[in-house]
Amino acid sequence: MSGCQFNQPYCPRSEEKKSIAESIEKATLMEPSIDAQSAQKGVYYGSYLKLDELLNIQECESVKVGAPAHEEMLFIIIHQTYELWFKQMIHEIDSIRSIMSTPPTPERLNGVIVNRLGRITEIQKLLVDQISILETMTSVDFLEFRNLLVPASGFQSVQFRMIENKLGILPNTRVQYQQHHYHSFFNEKDRKALQATENEVSLLQLVIQWLERNPFLYYKGYDFWSSYKSAVDQILENDLQRIQANNDLSQDMKDQSTKEAKKNMESFSTLFDEVAYNERLEKGEVRLSYKALQSAILIYLYKDEPIFHTPFLILNLLTEIDELLTMWRFRHTMMVQRIIGAKIGTGGSSGYHYLRTTVGDRYKIFLDLFNISSYLIPKNTLPQLPKVVKEQMDFAWSIL
């Protein structure tokens, strides 16, 4: 089998293979071996899962005050279940960050990353669907015990805030909660935990570094960006010519179509202006570095090349995580409006009105990956890859 690794600028020579194999072995997260003697002792289901503790930690406030509310048990279990799944998501995110934090990431482990990102998205789908269960509780049912929850709030889910931080949300992009920094609503222990996650290298930062290592942006005389720009320029010019040559269009329609085509040209001209792009980067309007953006566009355009199969899946799953986070926020917002209307939240926030501000691009971590669709071109217009590049992107099997 021949071909370069995606995130390595060279193919390993024979004398390097041993060290690479050793690094892969170290990076692979191996399960600990099970001692034969301990295995013979056996494990009891309830003891292993700590069910005695788990099933006895649902303490209803309504019971404590002598006015049991049937729906409070559902409310507690739903939120405890959310926190368990949040813990699993953090476990997966941390493992992915660990793999990507020691470059170059071995190709073998890219499959592990895909698997774990996929697991995160499946958990997220479950979290979105779980809202439907909570919605079986009516507004009147909730009012039976709602006042007993003050001043607790779902905003205080430290694990959810940790997930946001670990993925790459920045503190200054958050909508202020009751005009205060979000740290203000957590106890000292949780504040320290949140601050620690803010100081960690986020998944977004690691993805940017990973993209920047793409060796095929410039490879043995091949300049992807120059080739791509030439193709785009030709497409835009052809669009203008087709509009002018179309006699079925009225002059007004031609003028409108020409205006749209020129607007498209302006969008691409901004893309090809590195100085202008970096100014946007400084302002926080974009998050990907210019080189990382180029790399992502290359992967999206040539996703059918074997070397880019897995990187494309990784990028696609990252956008899916963002999409599902937005879906969860939206469903949560609609549920809150449905159950409490415009009432003030138990934590003192504006409730529905605050939650509505969190549904949008402001909270998307991988927004730049979504916007790449604006810069993709049809397959039949893609510049042909030079033979030397295509050979290195390919995987070839042969029997000696």
From Swiss-Prot:
Cofactor: record remark: Binds 1 heme group per subunit.
EC number: 1.13.11.11
InterPro entries referenced in this protein's UniProt entry, alphabetically: Trp/Indoleamine_2_3_dOase-like, Trp_2_3_dOase
Catalyzed reactions: L-tryptophan + O2 = N-formyl-L-kynurenine
GO MF term set: heme binding; metal ion binding; tryptophan 2,3-dioxygenase activity
Cytoplasm is among the record's keywords: no
Amino-acid positions noted as binding substrate in the UniProt annotation, renumbered to this chain: 75-79, 146, 346
Keywords: Dioxygenase, Heme, Iron, Metal-binding, Oxidoreductase, Tryptophan catabolism
Pathway this chain belongs to: Amino-acid degradation; L-tryptophan degradation via kynurenine pathway; L-kynurenine from L-tryptophan: step 1/2
Top-level taxon in the UniProt lineage: Eukaryota
Cofactor requirement: heme
Binding site for heme: 332
Subunit structure: Homotetramer. Dimer of dimers.
Assigned protein family: Belongs to the tryptophan 2,3-dioxygenase family.
Listed name of the protein: Tryptophan 2,3-dioxygenase
Species name: Dictyostelium discoideum
